[in-house]
């Protein structure tokens, strides 16, 4: 069975952020066939839809998506920005982040220029890659990975609003017989207590 799950998150300091996210998701829907998405196509759609109006020029969004094109057990993960995809592994009963943010801090980490656990100014979290309603904006190709899922593994696609509050190592475990609604309520309670 073929399917696609995605989340787009409008960048809060850009104009009409919610409209940017909606437009990015709409760009995905324009492609009726399930196939690997091209970041350039989504970028061009956003430009065509929003860059030519004064109030929406520069509207920006991130995107994370998971696709299954029918290959047994394998999913394709694509993302730009700081929306993420997580895996809950039934094997080790832990959540694992499958994507890396496209920001300056992550770039420094990849280059070995920062110390784990160190405090860094919030400016280092600035995004390096995102979609933007500006014809001069260049977007890189998606970061694409494949993941093999085993029985009772679970995937979660989310925005930075979740992982900025609580890292996945603190998330409640997902039990095989647990209803998704119960897990989501546990997660919401955990997030609420972190923000209090």
Q: What role is predicted for each listed range?
A:
Residues 1-196:
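PP2C/PPM-type serine/threonine phosphatase catalytic domain
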